[in-house]
Amino acid sequence: MIPFPQGTHRAADEKSLPRSIIAALPRTYAIIFYSTDLRFGWAMLALNLCVPWIGLAGLAGVLAAACLAWVLQVDRGWIRSGFALFNPLLACSAMVLAGMLGGWAPGVIVMLWAAAAVFSLLLTIGMQGWIGSRMGLSVQSLPAVIVVCLLHFTGVGSGGQQVVAQVASATSQIDLLAMPDVLQGFFRAFAAMVFQSSAGAGILVYVALVFSSPLGAVMATLGYVAGAATLWMLGLPMGATGTTWCGFNFLLAGVALGAGYQVPNRASLLLAVVGGGMTALVAVALSVWMGWFGLGVGALPYNLVVLGVMAALRLLPRPIGLIVSPWTTLQPEGMARLMQISALRFPHYYQPAVFLPGAGERVVTQGFDGALTHRGWWRHALDF
């Protein structure tokens, strides 16, 4: 069953911009965790607003991108689903955060915020058309990563500095300093999903995810643990000091590979673990390369791993144990439940079925490997 009701869709709503925006808001925030739960989306929106300027910048970016997409006549269903708007949300929030931490001039921050909203929307539309048509995959948050990296240089070139301070958060007052360092790193990875750095915010995000999708929370946990363990084997600290800069990539890879694109099962659980470890390796490599340009890795490691792994799996006829999810509007629990029901109703679904074209006695007039026809792909055909 779906944990929470997803709401009904009315065709008349597609003609109303305000109604479409209201429908898109919770989906835009929930889709970051590959969730379709509306209550979880509203919770993520509220947690984003715990850092008012960052949260409002992201919300305003979503509204601006929705209006622009409406004017450009982007598919209304794509707007309402949040797929067209979550990259502007991420890009606008990240640009304002970078501007506040770097001490950029207010006018520069506003200009780059507007550029992030427009560029990320257009890049999402363009890249989704290309990636979707060739690999059948979502563009992920790759447009936001590209836009933020490029506009970051604009801000620095205007006289701004690199990250020099921390932004105050309403949840920083509930940070638990006595918490073990490993747990600090774990919850701070979840806090980074709402552009915060306190373990208290991470606890709230994690609790919301557990209530929304227990399977999604399991996959995120496994992805993070695998990534943090990989960093530890590379000689880096496993706690907050060693994972805060990239830990959210691990949990996103776990959710995407374990419960986003695949129906949750034992094989997808293993894929989530492998994906988390691969993301850690890619993150370390990218940190060296991007450090030359004064950039952090952002969400690039997770994007590269998820797109690379899923593109490879798309080329396989049927990966052992993995079942590609045929539904994009269900929670992981709903997908798993429907697959169990389908397996009981159609136990031989994946076995080929051969039926004769008629009943009774028939005469075969031409058999296998005919001299003139029935060659190549058709060599096993029979004429009756």
Model-derived features with residue positions:
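Structural signature of hydrophobic alpha-helical transmembrane segments
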Residues: 48-61, 103-116, 186-198, 238-249
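Membrane-helix interface "capping/anchor" motifs
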Residues: 51-55, 71-83, 101-107, 125-137, ...
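N-terminal signal-anchor module of multipass membrane proteins
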Residues: 1-74, 148-151, 188-196, 200-212, ...
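Loop-to-transmembrane alpha-helix initiation sites
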Residues: 110, 134-143, 243-248, 269, ...
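Short, non-helical or kinked segments that cap or interrupt transmembrane helices
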Residues: 75-90, 136-138, 217-218, 222, ...
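Long hydrophobic alpha-helical segments that form multi-pass transmembrane helix bundles
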Residues: 142-195, 326-336
